[in-house]
């Protein structure tokens, strides 16, 4: 695919590329493959169950968009919906902030701290 434009959606914690990753780790634009990068800055602590929930939600959103043109707008909509879903996982306590991250900016709200009754 020569001179193809790389379509992408980038939110704080979700990046989607209309591309494949080649053997050298480079993105190669594609109209057939979407590549998902979750939490590229390692801002959160993840478990396998939470990651699988994100992947399933991504698959669900892509399936709901099947038949629509592959555009920046459609990718941004999927990315935005995934970002909101990630926030819901944080609010439910299924993921947590990584306090050892390079930067702790609490971009989805301050951490919840359980207080014991005395």
Swiss-Prot record:
It is found in: Cellular thylakoid membrane. Pfam families: NdhM. Its main location: membrane. GO terms for cellular component: plasma membrane-derived thylakoid membrane. GO terms for molecular function: oxidoreductase activity, acting on NAD(P)H, quinone or similar compound as acceptor; quinone binding. It comes from the Bacteria. It is a peripheral membrane protein. Its EC number is 7.1.1.-. Signal peptide: none annotated. InterPro entries: NdhM. It is an enzyme of class 7 (translocase). Keywords: Membrane, NAD, NADP, Plastoquinone, Quinone, Thylakoid, Translocase, Transport. It catalyses: a plastoquinone + NADH + (n+1) H(+)(in) = a plastoquinol + NAD(+) + n H(+)(out); a plastoquinone + NADPH + (n+1) H(+)(in) = a plastoquinol + NADP(+) + n H(+)(out). NDH-1 shuttles electrons from an unknown electron donor, via FMN and iron-sulfur (Fe-S) centers, to quinones in the respiratory and/or the photosynthetic chain. The immediate electron acceptor for the enzyme in this species is believed to be plastoquinone. Couples the redox reaction to proton translocation, and thus conserves the redox energy in a proton gradient. Cyanobacterial NDH-1 also plays a role in inorganic carbon-concentration. NDH-1 can be composed of about 15 different subunits; different subcomplexes with different compositions have been identified which probably have different functions. PANTHER family: NAD(P)H-QUINONE OXIDOREDUCTASE SUBUNIT M, CHLOROPLASTIC. Belongs to the complex I NdhM subunit family. This is NAD(P)H-quinone oxidoreductase subunit M. The gene is ndhM.
